[in-house]
């Protein structure tokens, strides 16, 4: 049960990377929408 801490850290890292990925996709979507509207 001593290896539960590294697992939790890896889960937190995956969540942060997932949030950054969603943010990047959102920014790209906004840029593409601006190109389409222009």
Swiss-Prot record:
* Keywords (A to Z) from UniProt: Chloroplast, Membrane, Photosynthesis, Photosystem II, Plastid, Reaction center, Thylakoid, Transmembrane, Transmembrane helix
Q: Which biological processes are named by the entry's GO terms? A: photosynthesis
For this protein, the record's Pfam families field holds: PsbL (PF02419)
Record bears the keyword DNA repair = no
Transmembrane residues, as ranges? 17-37
Topology versus the membrane: Single-pass membrane protein
Q: Where in the cell is it found?
A: Plastid, Chloroplast thylakoid membrane
Give the CC-aspect GO terms: chloroplast thylakoid; chloroplast thylakoid membrane; photosystem II reaction center; thylakoid
Query: Subunit structure, briefly?
Result: PSII is composed of 1 copy each of membrane proteins PsbA, PsbB, PsbC, PsbD, PsbE, PsbF, PsbH, PsbI, PsbJ, PsbK, PsbL, PsbM, PsbT, PsbX, PsbY, PsbZ, Psb30/Ycf12, at least 3 peripheral proteins of the oxygen-evolving complex and a large number of cofactors. It forms dimeric complexes.
Family stated for the protein in its record: Belongs to the PsbL family.
Q: What does this protein do?
A: One of the components of the core complex of photosystem II (PSII). PSII is a light-driven water:plastoquinone oxidoreductase that uses light energy to abstract electrons from H(2)O, generating O(2) and a proton gradient subsequently used for ATP formation. It consists of a core antenna complex that captures photons, and an electron transfer chain that converts photonic excitation into a charge separation. This subunit is found at the monomer-monomer interface and is required for correct PSII assembly and/or dimerization.
**Official protein name in the record:** Photosystem II reaction center protein L
Organism, by scientific name, is Arabidopsis thaliana (Mouse-ear cress)
**Protein's gene:** psbL
């Amino acid at each position: 049960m001593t290896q539960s801490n590294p697992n939790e850290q890896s889960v937190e890292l995956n969540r942060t990377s997932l949030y950054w990925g969603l943010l990047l996709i959102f920014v790209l979507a906004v840029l593409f929408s601006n190109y389409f509207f222009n």
